[in-house]
Amino acid sequence: NEEKRIHKMNDYIARFRVNDFEKQELKEHIREVQKLAAAMGKRVDLRRTVSLKELHSDKKATLENTLSLVGLLHDFGKYSIKFQRFIHEEWRRAKEGIESKRQSGIDHGVYGAKYIYDLSGKYGPNGRIVGELLANVICYHHGGLPDAEDFNGDSPLLMRLQDENRLTDYEQVKVAFFKDLQITEQEIEQLFKKSVEEIKLLILKSSTGSEAKNKRKNDANFMPN
């Protein structure tokens, strides 16, 4: 059947051009977005506000690793067979001149968000802060970013991550993602660790004057060195 064929052939696609129906492989799309995002992050110079000498670090102060990680995980959920069935059917309809459905009804952003949120739990409260930040970016990368909490004090992100109906095929998606991209979970963990350090600098960058001094004094309470 179609699902077995997609798995066997690794025929995962991200999208296609409507003028000539050329498909773009999902792994190609992810790598291109990751590369562009990393390049954008590399241009963010946090040293303009934060003194690296004060932070006892000689590392480059950019968001390169953070945005690289977000780019890598943003379409994690498109490895869902549900999404692949939809996009392959849309490609067929386009070739046959049939009107597009336009909306898949599949929440592909939640998959990568769940992955990074779960991973962040291994790194204590500070890792969780960064994990929740990145999970929001990944989960809502098509827009609609909500407040951190609603009027009832609930987190829209956590409610979305805990909705099992959205993630019934999560394990299958994770296996397909790592197999197709030929990367390891250890590689993602290394990116995450570097992201934690970058976000630490970003937090300090947002502080000025006496507020910045207080932030630096209490830095150990927020981010580990």
Give, region by region, the residue ranges found by the protein language model.
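Accessory nucleic-acid engagement/destabilization modules that flank
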Residues: R5-I6, N10-D20, L26-N225
